[in-house]
Design a protein with these regions (language model features):
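Glycine-centered secondary-structure boundary/capping sites
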Residues: 51-56, 103
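Long, helix-rich interaction regions
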Residues: 1-23, 91, 115-171
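Context-gated lysine
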Residues: 37, 48, 56-57, 96, ...
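Alpha-solenoid helical repeat scaffolds
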Residues: 36-37, 48-49, 61-71, 77-80, ...
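Structural detector for internal amphipathic alpha-helices that build alpha-solenoid repeat scaffolds
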Residues: 19-38, 58-70, 90-102, 124-136
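Alpha-solenoid helical repeat architecture
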Residues: 17-21, 36, 48-52, 64, ...
Length: 171
């Protein structure tokens, strides 16, 4: 599927969802996922340009969140979109797909590079993004009878067929 066409269908479907006060993601993302064979160089450049556009960047975050993997060429632009996102509660939309596909150390290295070489606003953005760019360790106490055991685990990402998206869970 063509990226520009997919975006146009996405926007139309998203507008319909909002108009009807429905929650969910546009179905075109699932269709794209089923037909996805990889991105061309043109697709990658288009997605990079979309990440610099305040409206189109959300499409890229949603699209990559639906794919099993995506090229390393999109990692830094995705993280940069998280850094420049003014609302810290939304920058995870760009980081979550990266966490699922790439190593935490690689993500943190890129963010630290942006911090070292960035402007004051970029440095503030990196500090906000680092909140999401870390392995999450969970500790769970299980009470069974008179016995208390503690379990620890990390985030694990898996495709949820019912929700048609990747979700993370405790493992």
């Amino acid at each position: 599927m063509d990226i520009q066409h997919t975006f146009e269908v996405y926007r139309t479907q998203l507008d319909n969802l909002r108009r009807h006060n429905s929650y969910g993601r546009p179905q075109v993302l699932n269709q794209f996922r089923m037909q996805f064979k990889g991105f061309s160089e043109t697709d990658i450049e288009t997605l990079k340009a979309f990440l610099l556009d305040d409206d189109k960047k959300w499409f890229v975050a949603d699209l990559l969140d639906h794919l099993r993997e995506f090229p390393r060429d999109l990692l830094r632009p995705m993280l940069y979109s998280a850094v420049i996102e003014p609302d810290a509660s939304f920058n995870n939309e760009f980081i979550k797909p990266c966490r699922r596909v790439f190593d935490f150390a690689e993500i943190q290295k890129i963010l630290l590079d942006i911090f070292q070489n960035g402007s004051k606003d970029e440095k503030i953005g990196v500090l906000k993004a680092l909140y999401w760019a870390r392995p999450t360790v969970y500790s769970l106490q299980v009470h069974s009878g008179g016995k208390v055991t503690e379990q620890q685990g990390y985030d694990v990402f898996g495709w949820d067929d019912e929700l048609k998206s990747y979700n993370y869970d405790f493992n």
